Amino acid sequence: MGKEKETRNYSRRYKSEYNIFRSIFFMIFLWVVVNPVTFFMYKLKVKGKNNLPKKGNYILAPNHVSEMDPPFVASAVNKHIAFMAKKELFDKSDKRHDLIHLLGAFSVDREKPEIATFKTVKDIFQTNWPLGIFPEGGTKKNKKIEDIRKGFVVIAKHAKADIIPISIVGFDGYAKKLFEKDITVVIGEPISYKLDADEIIQKWCAEICKNTGFENCMLNKEEKVEV
């Protein structure tokens, strides 16, 4: 019962939580803690930043190769992001969930989003925070795009929010010293939420594989998505 209650609490967040104070905290944390790591240890480069919408709701959807992906994405877009984190992370008794919750993240079942998830998304999109979702559901180290979680499409359609595919390119391990790694974040053109669910998934996979060189195991694979 305790774990179930904790997950429910972390999955439901309100518009009032994404206020100016949390926005300022996020950006200070980004500039003071995150950016020095991403730019000086991973020599982060950003391509396609002009593809970010100037206004309106949108979902940032990166591939997932490491636990550094949220920092890479936040540094690349230079904006506060409400990341969806897998519910298992909030079930663990470690300190990470306290920090990411403070930074605006919330718990989600990506395979079967709950009503609380849609209410949270609706509240977030009444602010100027974009949503961050990893369609793969967890980190993948086999250089293949496969087993995409369909929840991000369901959420995009319910929220009427376009999807911005983001490719994280070049990760081959964690940096231990300055200027050791080279990471490129490629921000792709928006994918309309109005497209068929299967087409959205195929477009996302194709964009990620084009930039990363990963094998597209979702090619021509149909996904049945209930919206």
Model-inferred region functions:
Residues 48, 85-86, 104, 134-135, ...:
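A secondary-structure boundary/capping signal
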Residues 33-34, 102-108, 135-139:
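Short, basic, glycine/proline-bearing loop/turn elements
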Residues 39, 54-112:
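Catalytic core of membrane glycerolipid acyltransferases/transacylases, capturing the structured
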Residues 46-47, 106-109, 193:
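Short acidic-hydrophobic, aromatic-tinged amphipathic segments that line or gate anion-handling sites
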Residues 2-21, 116-227:
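Non-catalytic C-terminal accessory region of glycerolipid acyltransferases
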Residues 45, 112-118:
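Glycine-rich, highly charged phosphate/nucleotide-binding loops
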Residues 49-53:
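Glycine-rich helix-loop-beta junction characteristic of Rossmann-like nucleotide cofactor-binding loops
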Residues 2-48, 72, 92-103:
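A transmembrane-helix-recognition feature enriched in membrane-embedded lipid enzymes
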